[in-house]
Every structure is written in C-alpha cells, then in structure tokens.
Amino acid sequence: MTKLTQQDAWAQLEAQAAKLPHMRELFEADPQRFDKMSLSACGLLLDYSKNRADEQTLEQLFKLAKSAGLSDKIHAMFDGEIINNTEKRAVLHTALRAEADEVILVDGQNIVPEVKQTQAKMAKFVEAVTSGEWKGYTGKAITDIVSIGIGGSFLGPKIVTQALRPYWNPALKCHFVANVDATSLCEKLRLVDPETTLFVMSSKSFGTQETLTNTLSAKAWFLKNGGTQVDIAKHFVAVTSNVAKATEFGMDADNIFPMWDWVGGRYSLWSAIGLPIALLIGMDNFYQLLAGAKSMDKHFVEAPLEQNMPVIMGLFSLLYGNFYQAQSHVVLTYDHYLRGLPAYFQQLDMESNGKSVTLNGDNVDHATGPVIWGGEGTNGQHAYHQLLHQGTALIPADFILPLQSHNPLGEHHVQLASNCFGQTQALMQGRTFDEALAELDGSSQSQEEKALIAKHKVMEGNKPSNTLLMDKLTPETLGALIALYEHRTFVQGAIWDINSFDQWGVELGKTLGNDVLARLQSDEEAKALDASSNALINLFRRGHL
C-alpha cells in the first residue's frame, strides 16, 4: 500500500491548505453552507460549516479515508478481528452495546450471551442495593458508594455519573478515588460511614498498584471502624478477572463482576466497570446509555463516509494536525453537567493516538494525536479563549450544547447559548483592522492612538470549530456523544495506520515506577539510576530539602 503521505489526496490537501479562502469568504459565497455542512444522527446535530474546507477539501479528505481502507477497518473492528496487533486482541467495546440476538465471535465463541449475563447480574445487584434489600453489617441500607479504580476504570464512571446528576437516586451518593495520594482516599473516607458504605474496586488483575493500595487502605479503615473480616463481603465488591485474589481479599464470588481482554480500560464504562453508574442512575437508565452508544455504532457502520458523523469529525481533526500544524484541540462544553468530558476525551484520544510508529513498526512521517484539553463554557471565555482568538497557534475547537437545560432559570440558558454561538462566530469571523478602527469612531483619542489600539483589537478569525447540539442531556444522548468521540478517535488512528488500542508508554511508566518504589523503600542510598533520579530518591527518603 502506498504510504499515507505519498497519496494523491495528501498532496491535494497540502496544496489546498495553502490557498483556501478565509471562512468569511466561504460563507459569503454560499448562503446554504450550513445546510450543506451539517448532519443529524442519534439525537445529535453536528454543524461543521465553520471549518476550513470547501467541496474540494471534503472530496480529498474522503478520498484519503477510502485510500486508507477506512470502511474495511471499521468492519474489522466490529467483526472482532485482531486489530490490536501488539497484544493480539480483538477490540470489542462495541459488543457491550450489542442486542441480545447478535452474534459476535471471539476465538470462535459468541461473547454476547456472556455480556448479557453480566448485565443481568449487574441489574440484580443494583436492585438489591437501591431497594434497601442489601444491608451493611449492622443491618442498615447502603447510602454511599466509593468507587476505587484508575484510568479508564475511574474516569469513565466518574464523568458519566457527573454528567447524569439529574438522574441520581436521591438515597445514594458516589465518591471516586483513583490517585495513590492518600489525601484523595482520606478526604472521601471522612464523608462516609463504614456501616452504610459500599466499596466497588475495579482492577482487571486485582493488582494495579494504585487501586490495590487504596483498596487495602479502605479495608483497614473499615476494620478499624467496627467492621470485621466476615463483614467484608457486605461492603466490598469487585470488577476483575482475578476471582481468586478477590475472594482471598474477602469478597463473595457472587459479587465479583467479570472483565474481558477485548475491552480496553478507556473504553470500559459500558461494561461492569460502569457498576457505579448503574447504582447511581438505575439499570434502566444505564441501558439507555448503552442504547445511545449502540445507535452511534449503527450509524458509524452503516452511514456512507460522506454522511458519517465520527468520520467527518475525525477527518477534520486530521486535517488540522497534518496540514495546518495544529498541535492541540479544545473541547468546550456549554453545560455544567458536562464539565468533565474534556478530561475524558483527553484520555480517550491521547492514550489511543499518542503513537509514533505504524502497525508494521515503521516510524510515522507525519503528526499523530494532538493534545486534547478544554473546559466549561462560559468560564473559559474569561481565561484561555483569549489565546484561541488572538494567539499564534491554530487550535480547532468543539462546542457542545444541549438546547434545553435540566435547570431552567430565568435567562440563564439563553445567555449560555448566546455565548456559545457567539464564540463560534467570533472565531470564524474575527475582526479586521478597518472594523476595529470604525468601532473607535467618536472617541477622543488621536488618529494615531486609534490606529494603535485598532491593531491590538484585530482578530484574524478563520479559526475552525464544530458545534454539537442535542435536545437535552439524557443517558441516551450522552451515550451517543461518548461513542461519537470513541469512533472519531478510531477514524484518525485507522487512517494514520497506528494501533489506537495499546499503551506501551503507560506500561513503561508503571514498570519504572515499581523500580523506583523498591529503591524508595530500601535502606541503601540510591546510586544505580541516573544522577537526577538518584538525587530525588535520596531527598525524598531524607524527608526535607
């Protein structure tokens, strides 16, 4: 296969990037631009008209996708082929959203029945806890869930429960612990009562350093505050593949939920890793979350590339990284409940596409994954939006807004929407020198002063953005939104021909961290590592500067 950067479409896109008119001109030339460059699917509307693209750009982007075999790669993932080539694994988080009558094979076995059995087990457990049938060791009902995990087993459930706050069971609270920093755990334990607290420990191996350390400390706290070893089973459950270690810990085998190798951590919220979500919002709403993601799966598989929402978003991100040297991408959520999504999408994209070799091990000769960052509108407008408007770096943006608020109050939501739409317009349109100068008419300043100030008020514009709308934030629309970004991430990795489903950089950090831990716990002065690491270890062991 011809290298990506040697494809004709690549050369065409390079040429077009240098000569494409300003977006102001593109909108002036085509009053129907929004109608032509917007798309509705799965309860979401994507407005991609404020991107640096004309019909030729789109044509070449789709040509590039086709030359990379994108459609075949999409089907390969959904069919359970081994697309994670370094770990020899299928990638089937989509199977967690499958219908009961679907057949999805892994090693010749249909995995859908096992998925459905696990969901049924989750439903039974959720009902027991939320109904009050499940009691703590003193006979009291559960009031607090403490979810202990790290990475995908922490961030996904945390962000989803945060986003779906209006759907919470009022009788339950959920607290999330990930960092091995003791402060994280201790602050949560101060909020809960051992008699009414349920700990959900999520670790595939039951040996992840941070998760195991936090779980052992939680167990010690529980035993210190009235619980006994026999009571552990009433207050600790696990999501793990290592049943033996979980039962040795004191958990009942009936309350251990499975994990599978064909689900990566950052794609795992749809599995039993989502147990804290289900406990808080109820199993019916959890099923709606899955249904929303399933609808996006269906759209991704069936829609032509030219009308495919994840494909379009992935291609535009690729366009800016590879042809405009954009090194970051900002996600701006105009809904307080969605304030955590940028961090979730950050992990999803950067852990997936932060790669520098192709599937065959060749060094890539182009940029891959950008830095993903962002925050909550309108807060960001009074902070980092300044850089978006007048900084020297091109930073594409995604704006996300529900049309209806869960908390309608006066003019709040219409003001929120006006800021969202106004920002996308300002980024696209900018302000010319003449426009800035005209705004100063009537002031008492000299012409020289006006000219100087006008130069500082100029904004180039032509800054690209997508706008994503939904009627209202619900479990179903949230599921579709998260699946959209999952598939958008896949599209980029598939075209770049990289493995979006391993994370060897993360693994190296774990290995070296364990090595350093052994040296920190040793009585001997650190000498074997580099001079900097040795000095830092010795300073830490001394306990002061």
Swiss-Prot record:
Residues forming the catalytic site: 351, 382, 510
Top class in the EC scheme: isomerase
Localization annotation: Cytoplasm
Cellular component terms (Gene Ontology): cytosol
EC number(s) reported in the record: 5.3.1.9
Keyword Methyltransferase: no
One Pfam family recorded for the sequence: PGI
Keyword Isomerase listed: yes
GO BP of this protein: gluconeogenesis; glucose 6-phosphate metabolic process; glycolytic process
Xref: InterPro entries: G6P_Isomerase, G6P_Isomerase_C, Phosphoglucose_isomerase_CS, SIS_dom_sf, SIS_PGI_1, SIS_PGI_2
Main location (coarse class): cytoplasm
Catalytically driven reaction(s): alpha-D-glucose 6-phosphate = beta-D-fructose 6-phosphate
Keywords: Cytoplasm, Gluconeogenesis, Glycolysis, Isomerase
Pathway involvement of the protein, from the record: Carbohydrate biosynthesis; gluconeogenesis; Carbohydrate degradation; glycolysis; D-glyceraldehyde 3-phosphate and glycerone phosphate from D-glucose: step 2/4
GO molecular function annotations of the record: carbohydrate derivative binding; glucose-6-phosphate isomerase activity; monosaccharide binding
Cysteine pairings via disulfide bonds: none
Purpose of the protein: Catalyzes the reversible isomerization of glucose-6-phosphate to fructose-6-phosphate.
Homology family: Belongs to the GPI family.
Protein name: Glucose-6-phosphate isomerase
Organism: Shewanella loihica (strain ATCC BAA-1088 / PV-4)
Lineage of the species this protein comes from: Bacteria, Pseudomonadati, Pseudomonadota, Gammaproteobacteria, Alteromonadales
